[in-house]
């Protein structure tokens, strides 16, 4: 097993886990880009299962917010219910069973709430956190973008589902690459993030103005 260097953010199937956060029925009509982010989280789940990466799923106050949406494809997974914004407290025992764990791949909602709190708690544990930005969203675009910036300030790696999947596979000679390639062929749509990353790029340029 290769050791992941924190400065590089490399990820390996044998030392990674996928967190799926609170993609529930009652949030369907409240969250920006909900179908798109669930679709990207679903392909993360498919690839994680193909590569035998552990997956943990939570539901936030399911009595009020309902069950996980079926299109995520998580019907066979054990679901942990929670009231804390962070996923870490209800999943603590599961994490303790994985001494080899180095990297957490994080998808779900809401970015400024449960995703941010989960990411900070995981960083506190000394884990690398990789947020799939195309698989996370919020009710408010401003809260979503500010939360992404806040996580990046704290050391979270911002990525996309495809970037993470290709990091995990690493080689077109991988025995499952052709199947994974089929999963990646769905069209990519803008979900409001191009401006965020364009702004990041401009902030690095001399004499740039916001």
From Swiss-Prot:
Modified residues (N6-succinyllysine): 178
Tissues expressing this chain: Ubiquitous. Expressed predominantly in uterus, stomach and urinary tract.
SUPFAM superfamilies named in the record: Isochorismatase-like hydrolases
Superkingdom as given in the UniProt entry: Eukaryota
Keyword Nucleus attached: yes
Family annotation (InterPro entries): Isochorismatase-like_dom (IPR000868), Isochorismatase-like_sf (IPR036380), Isochorismatase_domain (IPR050993)
One cellular component (GO) term of this entry: nucleus
Annotated localization: Cytoplasm; Nucleus
Keyword Nucleus: yes
Keywords: Cytoplasm, Nucleus
Recorded family membership: Belongs to the isochorismatase family.
Subunit structure: Interacts with CDKN2A.
Protein name: Isochorismatase domain-containing protein 2B
Organism: Mus musculus
Source species taxonomy: Eukaryota, Metazoa, Chordata, Craniata, Vertebrata
Gene name for this UniProt entry: Isoc2b
């Amino acid at each position: 097993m290769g050791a992941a260097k924190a400065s590089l953010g490399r990820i390996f199937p044998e030392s990674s886990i996928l967190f799926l956060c609170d993609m529930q029925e009652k949030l369907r009509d409240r969250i920006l880009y909900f179908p798109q982010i669930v679709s990207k989280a679903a392909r993360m789940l498919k690839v994680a299962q193909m590569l035998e990466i552990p997956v943990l799923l939570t539901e936030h106050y399911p009595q009020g917010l309902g069950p996980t949406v079926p299109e995520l494809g998580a019907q066979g997974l054990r679901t942990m219910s929670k009231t804390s914004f962070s996923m870490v407290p209800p999943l603590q025992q599961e994490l303790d069973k994985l001494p080899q764990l180095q990297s957490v791949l994080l998808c779900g909602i809401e970015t400024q709430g449960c995703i941010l709190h989960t990411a900070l708690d995981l960083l506190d544990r000394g884990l690398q956190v990789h947020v799939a930005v195309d698989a996370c969203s919020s009710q408010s675009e401003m809260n979503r973008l500010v939360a992404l910036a806040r996580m990046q300030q704290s050391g979270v790696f911002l990525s996309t589902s495809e970037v993470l999947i290709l990091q995990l596979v690493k080689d077109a000679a991988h025995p499952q690459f052709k199947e994974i390639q089929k999963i990646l062929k769905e069209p990519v749509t803008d979900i409001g993030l191009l401006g965020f990353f364009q702004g990041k790029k401009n902030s690095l340029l001399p004499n740039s103005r916001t």
